[in-house]
Amino acid sequence: MEFVSGYRDEFLDFTALLFGWFRKFVAERGAVGTSLEGRCRQLEAQIRRLPQDPALWVLHVLPNHSVGISLGQGAEPGPGPGLGTAWLLGDNPPLHLRDLSPYISFVSLEDGEEGEEEEEEDEEEEKREDGGAGSTEKVEPEEDRELAPTSRESPQETNPPGESEEAAREAGGGKDGCREDRVENETRPQKRKGQRSEAAPLHVSCLLLVTDEHGTILGIDLLVDGAQGTASWGSGTKDLAPWAYALLCHSMACPMGSGDPRKPRQLTVGDARLHRELESLVPRLGVKLAKTPMRTWGPRPGFTFASLRARTCHVCHRHSFEAKLTPCPQCSAVLYCGEACLRADWQRCPDDVSHRFWCPRLAAFMERAGELATLPFTYTAEVTSETFNKEAFLASRGLTRGYWTQLSMLIPGPGFSRHPRGNTPSLSLLRGGDPYQLLQGDGTALMPPVPPHPPRGVFGSWQDYYTWRGLSLDSPIAVLLTYPLTVYYVITHLVPQSFPELNIQNKQSLKIHVVEAGKEFDLVMVFWELLVLLPHVALELQFVGDGLPPESDEQHFTLQRDSLEVSVRPGSGISARPSSGTKEKGGRRDLQIKVSARPYHLFQGPKPDLVIGFNSGFALKDTWLRSLPRLQSLRVPAFFTESSEYSCVMDGQTMAVATGGGTSPPQPNPFRSPFRLRAADNCMSWYCNAFIFHLVYKPAQGSGARPAPGPPPPSPTPSAPPAPTRRRRGEKKPGRGARRRK
């Protein structure tokens, strides 16, 4: 699949952005000394002419004593590829944070402190054998050690940990894999308690971070022990001023977050000693330094790191701070850094992966942007904007605990309840008897009491559901309820339309398989709402997928509608009962939750009534090539959602390859999430559960059934890449309908 927007963990895009900016910064900065001084002098004149940012900027000084970075060797023998942006954003980028585990991990530098007396003799013997190699545990500062490398050190020693070979060459590096070789040579293997001998982790002794008062990250620098020749962080900031000043200059000339180059109206520093050392340097830039250093980590109580919106070129993956990015002049969907990348993408082989083939189709998809952004909520304009700042939106509403942490890259601090991924869902928090506890924020309750009477009809929009449920249109709970409401919409609308012979609305029990369910299982309690919407139906949800926590395999628990109790019953899992317990007419109906942590084609169990998959991305996982034939053999109604119309087309192609069947025309999901998803290399609109389609199975031999519908006739394909042209004011662009909202 060409685009992975909506399927890739946001933290990976964030990591690629950090490494891309840091690599550029290190390459241009060079080593500390005369070269750095000259570089800063060149930037000073440029920065003095920059426009002023009215926001306060903050230079954070964050010491680190306890966390190290361990660089792995990758899945293949030999040095790993590192974590350069080419690997993070290449043709086959990792999609999940767990995919980084073979290459990088975080380790505690305090491990092994217990039981040191028992291992003291072994450690002394190892030191003698290694020629006195020192430990990589926490190092105390020494007065005669320098915090930063000197000008005599080569530039490649300032490369970030895990950087790619290309980045090393740009910073003055040499042979392939030199980074990993240097780590192996300079850090001797250590025997640590509970671990096998391995290369000692790198220690990021200090992190310099430039942000504005709103939390937008503008620049970052890492001081790493050993590999960069620095000492560990002590109580002072000796020789840190040149590094900090270079970081400030580069952050103004090339801000990492968003916006054009600019200088702050005022700067504050989070360290008293560094503040004094910068008093004579910062005024050179035409920037006012605060009279006193910042005494707390954040300049204001509402501070939160903002969503970063640095875009990338679809072909070479350069970020917007490295090159000016413009969309294709014909479809306006794909971003390129210049004509060379546009032409390369236009002429890709085979033809059906080239932009020449996709350009008219993407133009048609872009015309749906206005329709997808049409939602009844009071915050619609904000959350459907291309510049939507999700982290700030959630933080401003106090949505920083429970299931809301699954939507944000920010991890709550001590004292905040968090549903850890991989644990039995909600077990510890269900004991209070409130099934909606994990959906709450820091303020008033988001979910009102369950209405005393079941709905008289079926709902087909957020507006209707919110009205019946007593919810304000200012409530963002739709972001979490998109999953159960989508299941409800499939049961009450789509199955009766596409499979009327099943008479599904009259069934008193339904077995539903939720396939490739990872994120959905992490939010499992949101499916409680199905008991409110379908009170007379006994539901069984079987979550299946190899992305589920292995420890959850074969778990089974029951959510019950009546009584106020919450209990754990041995042998049958969890039994949860809500706080509103009037028994419904027609008898009690339960929601059974079962888990199978394996690919769907390996799952053994009773035939379901319905199969549902959320944001499936058939083309992104090889197991679908075996799971789709399994569904073909079962021939049960199978509905899937996708985050874009483009993804639906790709799923149809995968279905045709895997089974010879097809997919129904996708239709917008009225219960899609209102939050627009980030897209790094394109301008298309992506929303969780945006479109729905169902599988069209290949007719069985001799059945006489009609074959699966083929794909729609292709749009005419241009023969040459579109040339950027200027349109006169007032002239409309041909072939385009409603434009997406800004």
Swiss-Prot record:
Protein keywords: Cytoplasm, Differentiation, Metal-binding, Nucleus, Spermatogenesis, Transcription, Transcription regulation, Zinc, Zinc-finger
Cellular location(s): Nucleus; Cytoplasm
Zn-finger region bounds: MYND-type: 313-359
Composition-biased stretches (Polar residues): 151-161
Binding, Zn(2+) 1: 313, 316, 337, 341
RNA-binding is among the record's keywords: no
Pro residues: bias regions: 708-724
Acidic residues bias: start-end ranges: 110-127
GO cellular component terms, semicolon-separated: cytoplasm; male germ cell nucleus
An example Gene Ontology molecular-function term: histone deacetylase binding
InterPro entries: Mss51-like_C, ZMY15, Znf_MYND
Pfam families (UniProt xref): MSS51_C, zf-MYND
Comp. bias regions, Basic and acidic residues: 166-189
UniProt region (Disordered), positions on chain: 109-199, 565-590, 701-742
UniProt disease annotation: Spermatogenic failure 14: A disorder resulting in the absence (azoospermia) or reduction (oligozoospermia) of sperm in the semen, leading to male infertility.
PANTHER family recorded: ZINC FINGER MYND DOMAIN-CONTAINING PROTEIN 15 (PTHR47085:SF1)
Name recorded for this polypeptide: Zinc finger MYND domain-containing protein 15
Species of the source: Homo sapiens (Human)
